C-alpha cells in the first residue's frame, strides 16, 4: 500500500509490540511515511505515565536511528475509559504535556474512549477535549458533526490565542446563526400553514390533496380535488404553478 499511495501516508499506528516495531517502522522509514506512535508494548497497557514515557522514548529513538525525522512522528495520548480508570484523563493530559513541552511532538487521541459506558457521553467528551487542548493536544479523532464538541474546540483555540482562531470562531458562529435563522423561518412557515389548515381553510386542504395526487400519480381523485379548489375560488394558473 505504501508503494502506491498517492502522497505521504500516515500510518495508524506503530507501537513497541515486537511485530509492529520490526515490520512497520522500517517500512515507514523506507517510504517516507509519517506514523502515529502508540505507547503500547508486548506487556500491554503501560502501568503508569512513566512507563508510557519510556515507551515513547524507545520508539522515538528507534525511528530516528532508521533515518526518520522528528516531524514524522505523532504521539497517541492513549486514552483509556474513565469508568475503568478514574485517572485516565489525568494520565492522558500528562502524556500530552510531556510530548508538547519536552519532546516537542504533536499529539492525537480518540475522544470517545474516555466516556465509554457513561451516560450523556457528549458532555464528558467535550470537557475532556477542552482540557486536552489546553495541555497541548494537536489533533483529535472525533465526530465533526457534533456541534457542541466542535464549538468547544473553536472556542478553546481562541482562548489559547492560536493563530487566526478568533476569526475562525466568529465565522463559525456566524454560519451557525444563519443556519438557525433559516431553520426557524421554515418552522414558522410550517406553523402558519398548519394554523391555516386547522382554521378550516378548504383551499389549503384541497391544494395539498392535489399535490399528493400528482406526486403519487393518483388519477382517480385528482379531478375531484381540482374541482374543489376551483369552487373555493382558486384560479387555474395558481393551481398549475403552485
Label every PLM stretch briefly.
Residues 2-71, 81-108, 112-242:
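ATP-dependent carboxylate/acyl-activation modules
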Residues 78:
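Short, well-ordered beta-to-alpha junction loops that form the rim of enzyme active sites
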Amino acid at each position: 500500500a505504501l508503494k502506491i499511495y498517492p502522497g505521504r501516508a500516515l500510518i495508524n499506528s506503530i507501537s513497541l509490540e515486537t511485530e509492529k516495531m520490526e515490520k512497520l517502522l522500517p517500512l515507514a522509514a523506507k517510504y517516507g511515511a509519517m506514523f502515529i506512535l502508540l505507547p503500547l508494548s508486548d506487556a500491554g497497557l503501560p502501568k503508569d505515565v512513566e512507563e508510557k514515557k519510556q515507551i515513547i522514548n524507545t520508539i522515538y529513538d528507534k525511528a530516528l536511528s532508521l533515518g526518520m525525522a522528528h516531524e514524522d512522528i505523532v504521539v497517541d495520548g492513549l486514552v483509556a475509559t474513565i469508568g475503568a480508570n478514574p485517572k485516565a484523563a489525568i494520565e492522558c493530559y500528562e502524556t500530552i504535556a510531556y510530548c508538547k513541552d519536552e519532546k516537542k511532538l504533536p499529539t492525537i487521541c480518540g475522544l470517545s474512549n474516555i466516556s465509554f459506558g457513561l451516560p450523556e457521553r457528549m458532555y464528558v467528551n467535550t470537557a475532556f477535549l477542552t482540557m486536552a487542548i489546553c495541555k497541548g493536544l494537536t489533533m483529535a479523532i472525533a465526530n465533526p458533526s457534533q456541534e457542541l464538541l466542535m464549538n468547544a474546540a473553536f472556542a478553546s483555540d481562541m482562548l489559547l490565542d492560536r493563530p487566526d482562531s478568533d476569526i475562525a470562531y466568529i465565522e463559525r458562529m456566524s454560519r451557525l446563526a444563519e443556519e438557525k435563522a433559516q431553520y426557524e423561518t421554515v418552522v414558522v412557515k410550517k406553523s402558519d400553514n398548519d394554523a391555516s389548515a386547522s382554521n378550516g381553510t378548504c383551499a389549503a386542504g384541497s391544494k395539498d390533496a392535489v399535490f399528493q395526487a400528482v406526486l403519487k400519480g393518483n388519477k382517480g381523485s385528482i379531478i375531484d380535488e381540482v374541482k374543489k379548489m376551483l369552487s373555493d375560488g382558486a384560479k387555474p394558473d395558481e393551481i398549475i404553478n403552485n
